Structures are given as structure tokens and as C-alpha cells.
Amino acid sequence: MKKNFVIICAAVFISNSSAAQGLLNKSEVVFTKQDSLRGSITKEREWWDVKYYHLDIKVNPKDSTITGSNTIKYQVVQEYDRMQIDLQNPLEIYKVIQDGVELEYNREGNVFFIELVALQKPDAVKELTVFYGGKPKVAVNPPWDGGITWKKDSNGNPFIASSCQGLGASVWWPNKDHMYDEVESMLISVNVPGNLTNVSNGRLLSVKKLRDGTKTFNWYVSNPINNYGVNINIGDYVSFSEKYKGEKGDLDWGGKYLEVKGSAARLGKRDHSFTGGAEIIDTLEALQLDTNR
């Protein structure tokens, strides 16, 4: 019986394998030039190593637009004078400035090629600023379908979030959109209406209230980060912070409630959104200690 079962399984496997091979032969994957520009380490990418980003943007819930700039600091690895920056349609780059000079550029689909004024010398550290804006792609079924979510909470306040692991971060901000080169640190400055809060990556450095009634939240990431990991989460959030007794001393950690405020009393009630957080950190610290032994 066992022998017959094995023979039957083998026959089914061979049959399915042949069918699958036939399907592959009939529908070969065709890569476009855009696929190659997006997925490969092009000449316009390989000559520079990204060191730092300052993403400085205004998010407007009224018209679903994002406008602002990204300052890119980079180290020259090879001599070259043309840079690839990725930004997906329908967003546009308005201008690129380096050392006070407006640079020329041309667009090829979701890729911008920036013409630098002179050959970049190896080991030099330079920077330029890309100004951009428009209405980014709307996420239809996040996080599986990437883009920006523009919704409202139960109180009618805007609820906005980015999701881009599949599509890439260039769906909402200009960058070197390839995972082989992670930026080493980053400042994320997000301007929002005064009644809202933006939660991004890293540590909150400051909140600046402006005369027009808006607020800018400045978040700093001090460690390498993938482009697609950079995010905005904008809504009517309540913040809190706690001290955690770590293996090597106290750690301060904070979070943002995922529910709307409702009232100031919620801070006193604590809706337990982060129940289990300390236990998670306990586990991670224990794993790290085991790894270092």
C-alpha cells in the first residue's frame, strides 16, 4: 500500500510539474525599462552613497496633497555627474538645488535624472535639495496596495497614513529607492493642521506651532532605515510615555494611541492599546543578551 501511494504521489508531482512548466513557457515574465531602472543598481545610483535625508513636507488633508522637499546628503564613491532620484507618478519634481544653483533634470517615467554641474570627486560629501509635490497615489487596499490613505475617524477628523513596502517609498517622497543603500540617519519634518498630530519614525525632537495655525512635527532617526520604513501617521492622537527598567538601565519609551482622543480624560483612563509592550521589550532584551554571550 505504501509503495503504491508513493508511486501515485510521484505521478501527480510529475504531472503538476509539467503543467506548471507549460504555464511558465506560455506566459514568460517581460521586464520593462522602468522595471530595470527601478530594480537595478544603475550607473546613476552606484557612484554615490546616501548618508542623510531631511524630508520636510506639508500634508494637506483638504486637497490630499503633499508638498515640500528632501535634502539629500551623500558621499561620492566614484567620479560621475548624473544622479538618479525616484519619484512615482503623479507626483512631480519642481526644482533641484545644489550650492545655490538650480540643476537641470529630465524625467523618464518614475525616474528623474539630475545633471550635476561638475564631476563629483571620490570621498567628497555633498548635498542637494529636491523640491516636489502633488497628489500621491491613493492606497486602495493598504497595506497590500501602497500609497497614502486619506480617511476620517469616527469624530470626523482626518486620518492619514502611508503604506509603501510593496510599491516603494518613492510613491510619496523622492529618494534613492533601492534597498541596497540605506540612509544612515534622517530628519522627518511634517507640517499638519493644528488640531492633528503626526507620528513618524525615531524620536520626537520638537513640535513647532506656526502663525497660520499649523504645527510641524520634527522626528529624528539616528540609525540606518529602509526607505519604505519611513512613514507618516496623521490623526487626532493622544501621546504618553513611560520608563522601562532595562537590563542596562532605564529606558524612556512612548507611543501614540491608535484611537482618537474623544476627551482629555482618555489619558487618565489608558485604553490599554499598548498592553504587553514591556513584555515584548523583555523578550527582545533577553534574545540580545543570549546572542552576545
Tell what function each PLM region has.
Residues S69-L91, W173-H178, V183-P193:
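Surface-exposed beta-strand/loop patches in extracellular or lumenal glycoproteins
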Residues Y52-H54, T65-T71, Y80-R82, V111, ...:
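Intrinsic-disorder/low-complexity, polar/charged segments enriched in Ser/Thr/Lys/Arg/Asp/Glu/Gln
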Residues A20-T67, Y94, D99, D153-P158:
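N-terminal, polar/Ser/Thr-rich
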Residues T42, F131-M186, G235-K243:
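Glycine/proline-rich low-complexity spacer/linker segments in large multi-domain proteins
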Residues L23-L24, Q88-K151, D212:
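A surface-exposed beta-strand-loop module
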